[in-house]
Amino acid sequence: MMENVFDYEDIQLIPAKCIVNSRSECDTTVTLGKHKFKLPVVPANMQTIIDERIATYLAENNYFYIMHRFQPEKRISFIRDMQSRGLIASISVGVKEDEYEFVQQLAAEHLTPEYITIDIAHGHSNAVINMIQHIKKHLPESFVIAGNVGTPEAVRELENAGADATKVGIGPGKVCITKIKTGFGTGGWQLAALRWCAKAASKPIIADGGIRTHGDVAKSIRFGATMVMIGSLFAGHEESPGETIEKDGKLYKEYFGSASEFQKGEKKNVEGKKMFVEHKGSLEDTLIEMEQDLQSSISYAGGTKLDSIRTVDYVVVKNSIFNGDKVY
């Protein structure tokens, strides 16, 4: 049994002496594989979070992105389209038989996406290990992200199989109900799980799920994440895919989980739900605010770069830091 687990709202980072005159001097960039990105943040590869338009916007502006895999037949034209514009192609694959053929087809057509994310709910499995090896054999130049996992053993095994990064988080997401439906996962202790996994990792880790505030991005970095995947905070923007509805004079957008009946079109093995989030304005504004908040985090950490956050002290506050006033 794990002792002393904690989640984002149980932790406060402790400030160190500031060395900048303005937070604008702080550098939030991060390198993943061969490319450098403006923020250590990636919108979730979910149908109500990202589409081709948003992927293009993110890539053009030096943000990392991962396209979802829910219209698999569009992936080849997507890769061609992105690369023809001089942008990175970053796609998702599953582990079913036709995905093996898809990888071979990419190799045959000499299409190498810069990033491939093997994306299944329970990533600590032979199915994922086999797919990592298959991709590495046919597309050795692609950077492979494998997940999702929640234990150090899983991180080690996927790294040993050839994964270039692992994605950590089982069910902590806002529209994920894995914890309720199965009793398993990292919901409620995602930050501790991240720390536990990061200690075992020799390659980058992507924290996935449970982020509710911008401060949680800094906390993820403190506990070992290179990149932080975010769903709900990116949902509900003008550009976001999904229906807009009006209720009591307020605008909302739908946001649903990746194994929800809304996404699957059926009610079998449902582990996701749908919710309506308040309409948030433009994605660009949110990304700019995230960058500014992270610059402030870096200045509180007493540094000029993201890495300075990794060494700050922290406290575990057993009463939630939000004193009952939920900020999200």
From Swiss-Prot:
Gene3D superfamilies: Aldolase class I
Keywords, alphabetical: NADP, Oxidoreductase
InterPro entries: Aldolase_TIM (IPR013785), Dihydroorotate_DH_CS (IPR001295), GMP_reductase (IPR050139), GuaC_type_2 (IPR005994), IMP_DH/GMP_Rdtase_CS (IPR015875), IMP_DH_GMPRt (IPR001093)
EC number: 1.7.1.7
UniProt keyword Oxidoreductase, yes or no: yes
EC top class, as a word: oxidoreductase
GO MF terms held by the record: GMP reductase activity; oxidoreductase activity, acting on the CH-CH group of donors
Similarity comment text for this entry: Belongs to the IMPDH/GMPR family. GuaC type 2 subfamily.
Protein name, UniProt field: GMP reductase
Species assigned in the record: Bacillus thuringiensis (strain Al Hakam)
Biological classification of the source: Bacteria, Bacillati, Bacillota, Bacilli, Bacillales
Name of encoding gene: guaC
